[in-house]
């Protein structure tokens, strides 16, 4: 579970981010929330984006309700 994270990005950031490790995406009022199981990759390569540690609830919600 510690490898999972929710990325919170603007539409502009979403277009530029590497989507290879994104499991699900979901439109939000701020832009796009993205679930990944490669948290460290995004922390190291995209320091400008918000990376929240994925709680079990967040991971389940994203897996059942996200797009992909």
What are these regions (language model features)?
Residues 1-36:
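ABC transporter nucleotide-binding domain
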Residues 30-68:
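C-terminal coupling/interaction segments
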């Amino acid at each position: 579970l510690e490898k999972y994270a929710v990325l919170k990005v603007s539409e502009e950031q979403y277009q530029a981010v590497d989507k290879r490790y994104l499991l699900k995406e979901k439109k939000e009022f701020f832009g796009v929330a993205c679930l990944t199981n490669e948290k460290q990759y995004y922390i190291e390569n995209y320091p400008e984006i918000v990376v929240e540690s994925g709680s079990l609830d967040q991971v389940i919600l994203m897996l059942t309700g996200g797009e992909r």
